[in-house]
């Protein structure tokens, strides 16, 4: 997403300043993880679109690890992670039919 051009007020309280420093670091980490998640999903969908069941299965295995790690870190709710895995799995199973 685009960065905000709004000028933010500086915080006076020490704990607030620390919170701002932490937010910058955590925001960067979350953005990176979210990007890794999207890339993993796209890889599986691309493999499904080509119709290659073997490649789709391999990419799904690696995507599962990424999805689970993101759910464990609390970036997404565990139910959302389960929903993504379920839908991707259904698409791969549909290739066999």
Swiss-Prot record:
Output the GO biological process annotations, alphabetical, semicolon-separated. translation
- Which UniProt key words apply to this protein? Ribonucleoprotein, Ribosomal protein, RNA-binding, rRNA-binding
Cellular component GO terms, alphabetical = cytosol; small ribosomal subunit
- Top-rank taxon of the source lineage equals Bacteria
Task: Write one Gene Ontology MF term.
Answer: small ribosomal subunit rRNA binding
The record's annotation in SUPFAM superfamilies points to: Ribosomal protein S20
Its function, per the record, reads: Binds directly to 16S ribosomal RNA.
The identity of this protein, by name, is Small ribosomal subunit protein bS20
Annotated organism of origin: Methylibium petroleiphilum (strain ATCC BAA-1232 / LMG 22953 / PM1)
């Amino acid at each position: 997403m685009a960065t905000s051009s709004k000028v933010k007020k500086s915080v006076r309280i020490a704990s607030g300043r620390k919170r701002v420093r932490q937010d910058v670091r955590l925001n960067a980490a979350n953005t990176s993880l979210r990007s890794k998640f999207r890339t993993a999903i796209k890889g599986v969908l691309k493999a499904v679109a080509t119709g290659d069941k073997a490649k789709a299965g391999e990419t799904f295995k690696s995507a599962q690890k990424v999805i689970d790690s993101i759910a464990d870190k609390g970036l997404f709710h565990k139910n959302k992670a389960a929903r993504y895995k379920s839908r991707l799995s259904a698409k791969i199973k549909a290739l066999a039919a």
